From Swiss-Prot:
This is Methionine--tRNA ligase. The keyword Thylakoid does not apply. Its cofactor is Zn(2+). It catalyses: tRNA(Met) + L-methionine + ATP = L-methionyl-tRNA(Met) + AMP + diphosphate. It is found in: Cytoplasm. Homodimer. It comes from the Bacteria.
Length: 683
């Protein structure tokens, strides 16, 4: 039971209205939808809103290529987006567009408040200009080499490789992505938001608990570099909102995009009499506001957005939750390079509930990347959902219908039910803190208990014995009651399955009625709830996205693993045999890298702090040539935990991390599978 009802507004980042939704996008919407559904299941007032991000030069140029207006294009894309989301059972309370009257009014109002408060500056800048297309080039239409890490083929506003943000004029060897011409410099007057004026407030805010610690650490690095004024204007031609009192100047898309959260909610409030916009957005609001975003847009949501709100006298979000990227079969997805599986391609071949569960089973509260391994995906769904969950009902429901008039018995032994109910607050807390993977493991552990109970009781044998009918009735009724509790726990993740189970059990699944007594309750005839994933369905998705997957796998070293394995054995033969007793002396443990840092004057070593779930060890690892320290923090690895400390000039090294590879850039630390915890022994 919930102690008091909370008022919650939750958002996902706005999908850009110039292309289809892919499975990388779906991670965020599934994550947010699960969290939102959980809050509603617990009885809270929760509103999940979103919108299409519908402004910018990319949309303007693509519409020109299609021979239609930008308005026509974004309307078409929005229809496709909404259908994809609906088919994935994403339950928005409102889905709107940033190209709306609500958003125009709000963006103008916020801008004018910032201007009147002295936070908008104007200055003449030199900007890249396409001499062939006669237009200033927006950030995303200039590509070149990152001025920070020197990675090539990066956009003009931020680097996908190192996460740095910069001005397009800082880009090395820039080229126009519109015409391929080398841009020239041209003067123009632009409007800037005085972000440095909010540095003190932002430093306090990011340490207030509103952000994940990983995000706060990254933002501190940006503070060290110094905050800069933010260019919020673009020159015509541009598809967006014209800036008040500035003909020919338009708001940069990243100014009105986050305001789109407010615009969508305002649209919802205008359609409902029971919702008040100011109850959620006024400075003294006690409602909770949460933004779920990808790690690539942390800078905008954790610096620009709260500073804009502060300057305009509007409340800031309660928390901003970032997640990592999705990879497919171990390889990075890239929308710009076309290496993605479209949501529609998936939906044409598989049940959306499968992906919802798989993502949930791998999600946590950190900013880890999530790998969609298609083989593991099929195995996990078939094992957990079909083999454990649905199987529990399919093995017992038929006996209730055929032998006991479809009515459940009074269960006299409540010991298993008590175990299941005792986990309710544990599972609820895991949902609340976005530790979905841990929640799924708790639920599946209960499913294992229930299936073991049915297997041991063997109702299919009991029903054959006249003197065992009551016992068979008890076992099947108990199993279905446990099944009901399991599906209730999974309702935020598997809403369609839960809906079908509600029809079968002829009751509504709510958190508050987990302990409901079903004695004498009549159920409907059981029908198959879920089918196994067949290899041909996975193959169909691969075939439909073949070009994308092949492009992705081009960068994946493991596609050449068989050849590499042979070559590596020739280069580095297997060592002489050792006894089992010798091997048993080595204590291998799972460790989380809690800190990683460079060592001054050390060419090969990084200093790692390894968390063993109760103890911390310092290790100097010779992996500097292959890893940047910031890429290691938070990762799980395997270490030799009982190696005698080795004194080095930098300090004592108290173990060794395991890595493979010949050296240099070709070093790969070992990472355990999802579910391993710091301190676990590797056997």
């Amino acid at each position: 039971m919930t102690k008091s009802q909370r008022k919650i507004l939750v958002t996902s980042a706005l999908p850009y209205a110039n292309g289809p939704i892919h499975l990388g996008h779906m991670l965020e919407y599934i994550q947010t939808d699960i969290w939102s559904r959980f809050q509603k299941l617990r009885g809270h007032e929760c509103h999940y809103i979103c919108a299409d991000d519908a402004h910018g030069t990319p949309i303007m140029l693509k519409a020109q290529q299609m021979g239609i207006t930008p308005e026509e294009m974004i309307a078409q894309v929005q229809k496709e987006h909404q259908q994809d989301f609906a088919d994935f059972n994403i339950q928005f309370d409102n889905f709107h567009s940033t190209h709306s009257e609500e958003n125009r009014i709000l963006a103008s109002d916020i801008y004018l408040k910032l201007r009147d408060g002295g936070y908008i500056k104007t200055k003449t800048i030199s900007q890249l200009y396409d001499p062939e297309k006669l237009m200033f080039l927006p950030d995303r239409f200039v590509k070149g080499t990152c001025p920070k890490c020197k990675s090539e083929d990066q956009y003009g506003d931020n680097c996908d490789n190192c996460g740095a943000t910069y001005s397009t004029t800082d880009l090395i060897n820039p080229k126009s992505a519109v015409s391929g011409a080398t841009p020239i410099m041209k003067d123009t007057e632009h409007f800037f938001f005085d972000l440095p004026a909010f540095e003190g407030m932002l430093k306090e805010w990011i340490q207030s608990g509103s952000l994940q610690q990983e995000m706060a650490n990254k933002l501190n690095e940006w503070f060290e570099q110094g905050l800069k004024q933010w260019d919020i204007s673009r020159d015509a031609p541009y598809f967006g909102f014209e800036i008040p009192d500035a003909p020919g100047k338009f708001f940069y898309v990243w100014l009105d995009a986050p305001i789109g959260y407010m615009g969508s909610f305002k649209n919802l409030c205008d359609k409902r009499d029971d919702l008040n916009f100011d109850d959620f957005w006024s400075l003294d609001s006690t409602a909770e506001v949460y933004h779920f975003i990808g790690k690539d847009i942390v800078y905008f949501h954790s610096l620009f957005w709260p500073a804009m709100l502060e300057g305009a006298g509007i409340r800031k979000p309660t928390s901003v939750y970032a997640h990592g990227y999705v990879t497919v079969n171990g390889s990075k997805m890239s929308k710009s390079k076309g290496t993605f599986i479209k949501a529609r391609t998936y939906l044409d071949n598989l049940d959306p509930e499968y992906l919802r569960y798989y993502y949930a089973a791998k999600l946590n509260s950190r900013i880890d990347d999530l790998d969609l391994n298609l083989e593991d995906f099929a195995q996990r769904v078939n094992s957990d959902l079909v083999g454990k969950l649905v199987n529990l009902a399919s093995r017992t429901a038929g006996f209730i219908s055929k032998r006991f008039d479809g009515k459940l018995a009074k269960v006299t032994d409540s010991s298993l039910t008590d175990i299941f109910l005792a986990k309710s607050e544990v599972i609820a807390e895991l949902y609340e803190t976005r530790e979905f993977g841990k929640a799924m493991r708790e639920i599946m552990a209960l499913a294992d208990i229930a299936n073991a109970y049915v297997a041991d009781a063997a109702p299919w044998q009991l029903v054959k014995q006249d003197d065992k009918q009551d016992e068979a009735h008890q076992v099947c009724s108990n199993a279905l009651n446990l099944f009901r509790i399991l599906v209730t726990y999974l309702k935020p993740v598997l809403p369609k399955l839960a809906e079908n189970v509600e029809g079968f059990l002829q009751l509504t699944l709510t958190w508050d009625n987990l302990g409901q007594d079903l004695a004498g309750h009549e159920i409907a005839t059981f029908k198959a709830l879920m089918q196994r994933i067949e290899p041909k369905s996975i193959e169909a998705i691969i075939d439909a996205s073949k070009e994308n997957l092949q492009a992705t796998n081009t960068d994946a070293p493991k596609t050449e693993a068989p050849t590499q394995a042979v070559n590596q054995l020739e280069l580095d033969p297997i060592s002489p045999e050792i006894s089992f007793e010798d091997f048993a002396k080595i204590d291998l443990r799972i460790a989380r890298i809690s800190k990683a840092e460079h060592i001054e004057k050390a060419n090969k070593l990084l200093r790692l702090e390894l968390d063993l779930g109760g103890d911390t060890k310092q290790v100097f690892a010779g992996i500097k040539s292959a890893y940047a320290p910031e890429d290691l923090v938070g990762k799980l690895t395997v270490m030799v935990a009982n190696l005698a400390p080795r004194t080095m000039k930098f300090g004592d090294s108290e173990g060794m991390v395991l890595a493979a590879g010949p050296g240099g850039k070709d070093l790969f630390i070992l990472e355990p599978h999802e579910g391993a915890l710091p301190g676990m022994r590797v056997k």
